[in-house]
UniProtKB/Swiss-Prot annotation:
It comes from the Eukaryota. It comes from Arabidopsis thaliana (Mouse-ear cress). This is Acetyltransferase At1g77540. GO terms for cellular component: peroxisome. PROSITE patterns: GNAT_YJDJ.
Length: 114
């Protein structure tokens, strides 16, 4: 394990990562800009389509993708925005593990998954 990876793991164990909203790049990202979840706004800004989640290999397994999703879902919730989970991590991993966020899923997506 490299020193960078060891430092990252130690920091993650003691405190949650700081996730910031980068509106210009249309993504939520870690403070170091290395991990992120990208989105596209649809329906005149009423729907956030989460299209891609990226975590560098040396930071995988630390829960960063989940923290990024929570930041996006919290943002959507506080702004009355619904979500389309186009990213496979969001739809196949995050939502099954965190079903309390499912009410934010855009109704047309929910209907098509029944």
């Amino acid at each position: 394990m490299t020193n960078t990876a060891a430092t990252t793991e130690a920091k993650m164990a003691t405190e949650p990562p700081k996730i910031v909203w980068n509106e210009g790049k249309r993504r939520f990202e870690t403070e170091d800009h290395e991990a992120f979840i990208e989105y596209k706004m649809r329906n005149n800004g009423k729907v956030m389509d989460l299209v891609h989640t990226y975590v560098p290999s040396f930071k995988r397994g630390l829960g960063l993708a989940s923290h990024l999703c929570v930041a996006a879902f919290e943002h959507a919730s506080s702004h009355s925005i619904s979500i389309i989970p186009s990213c496979s991590y969001v739809s196949d991993t995050f939502l099954p593990r965190n079903p309390s966020w499912k009410p934010l899923i855009h109704s047309e997506v929910f209907k098509s998954s029944i």
